[in-house]
Amino acid sequence: MVERGPTVYLSGLREKHFGELFLNAYNVSESSSATQASSSQAASSELGLSEEGLKHIARYIEYFESRYNDIWLVFHHEGVSLSKLMYTVEEAEISSEKAEEASHGQILRPSKWWTWLKTTESGKEEMRRIIWQLLLGLKACHDRNITHRDIKPENMVICLEDIKSGRCLKGVPNGDQNFKTNMRIIDFGSALDEYTIKHLYGSTGPSRAEQTHDYAPPEAILNSSWHHGPTSLTLKYDMWSVGVVMLEMILGSPNVFEISSVTRALLDQHIRGWSENFKELAYKLRSLMEMCILIPGSSLKHGGASSKQGGISLASWKCSEEFFAEQIKSRDPLKIGFPNVWALRLVRGLLQWYPEDRVTVDEALQHPYFQPPPSS
């Protein structure tokens, strides 16, 4: 159910718009596949490759409004979110100077499933399969000039389908259970296409309020009118988010762009008096520098050079594959890092500062990391 209120109401209408769009596309695809199967196997194969991504979009059923103008959106149950599979929640007591003010909070820890994902060959293949299916789902979006704009583990719902019953398993499967993985993208309330920008975002248009900061690319953080550019660049928003999701799966932490407490303390000396929003932006940019995504003192298109300010080296490291791999490995709780060099290179291709430099969804699907393509 979507409660009343103009902003949330419009979000619900966008969900309805995209739900109906993908439902119609899926029905047309199924009809076309049946026709092609009877006439040309080659054409059928090509169509199947093009439309396979529709199987990785949440299945919309219907929409209706109550007499109080509440919106009800009905979707199939598709499983549990990737975030719930990746993390376990632990209760923690948050201390305070006054004992009576002590409160309880929750801490996310990597789950046993995540450890399996990282430490076994079948787990590494599962990670490839999940990212592959995510890209297929995005291909179904991008082929229709739709930018999802909120790709993150919470919006990636996974069904570990039991082969015998066809139902989603409850919890993490044990070694004796035979299952197949199916990931679907949910939550199109922040998505963009030509129609929604004109009719379903109100007079002010899309804003940062519909974005999730940790998964948003630099252009969307720094420029509120980023979506006014060519559609080919707008779609690159999602490709950045895929890169962040991959790093999160590798690190077992949602804090992908996090700087050390020492670096933060040094940086704070130079940004005293700044607002909290600008401080958070400074921390984010510093993290992007450390990951060789933002290189200060030079244009990214003309190589990088180190720069110094206030006696502190801003980029005194070499932005090589080896440096990046070692940096990720050091932050990995298991000290494993990337499963192979192809995963590293795909992430670097996704996390490019300039959207025009990022790989497209088709290029990502053809990347050596996915050779041979994951099995279903």
UniProtKB/Swiss-Prot annotation:
GO terms for cellular component: nucleus. Gene3D superfamilies: Transferase(Phosphotransferase) domain 1 (1.10.510.10). Residues 1-370 form the Protein kinase domain. GO terms for molecular function: ATP binding; protein serine/threonine kinase activity. InterPro entries: Kinase-like_dom_sf (IPR011009), Prot_kinase_dom (IPR000719), Ser/Thr_kinase_AS (IPR008271). The protein kinase domain is predicted to be catalytically inactive. Belongs to the protein kinase superfamily. Ser/Thr protein kinase family. This is Probable inactive protein kinase At3g63330.
